[in-house]
Amino acid sequence: MDSNTLSSFQDILMRMSKMQLGSSSGDLNGMITQFESLKLYRDSLGEAVMRMGDLHSLQHRNGKWREQLGQKFEEIRWLIEEVRHKLKTTENSFEQITFMQALQLLFEVEQEIRTFSFQLI
């Protein structure tokens, strides 16, 4: 994983965990959980690409990996919409900056996962 992407994930997760958004804190916790899950999935795909021999074991272990890939893209789209919504509704500049960075990170991660998946196909 690119060290900048790793630090971006860690920074955004830390910032989001410090936010107090009132009644929407449950939504924010869900977003944080989704970000963490997405990071782990992206890391595992990246590792599989680095060890191309793992492609066969990945396919044998989980014949539904393409289906899971589709689900991850749905999660990314959901997170993008949630982050956009939060960005539109917040007036706090710290939160706006955090959500703008989160949105940029989601676009980068989506592109990286697409690249990894094409290499695995």
Curated annotation (Swiss-Prot):
Annotated InterPro entries: Flu_NS2 (IPR000968)
GO term, biological process aspect, one: exit of virus from host cell nucleus through nuclear pore
Subunit structure: Interacts with protein M1. May interact with host nucleoporin RAB/HRB and exportin XPO1/CRM1.
Name the record gives this protein: Nuclear export protein
Function statement: Mediates the nuclear export of encapsidated genomic RNAs (ribonucleoproteins, RNPs). Acts as an adapter between viral RNPs complexes and the nuclear export machinery of the cell. Possesses no intrinsic RNA-binding activity, but includes a C-terminal M1-binding domain. This domain is believed to allow recognition of RNPs bound to the protein M1.
Pfam families, A to Z: Flu_NS2
Organism: Influenza A virus (strain A/USA:Memphis/10/1996 H1N1)
The keyword Disulfide bond is annotated on this UniProt entry: no
Miscellaneous section: Average number present in a viral particle is estimated to be 130-200 molecules.
Sequence similarity: Belongs to the influenza viruses NEP family.
Keywords: Host nucleus, Host-virus interaction, Transport, Virion
Subcellular compartments: Virion; Host nucleus
Location (main, coarse): virion
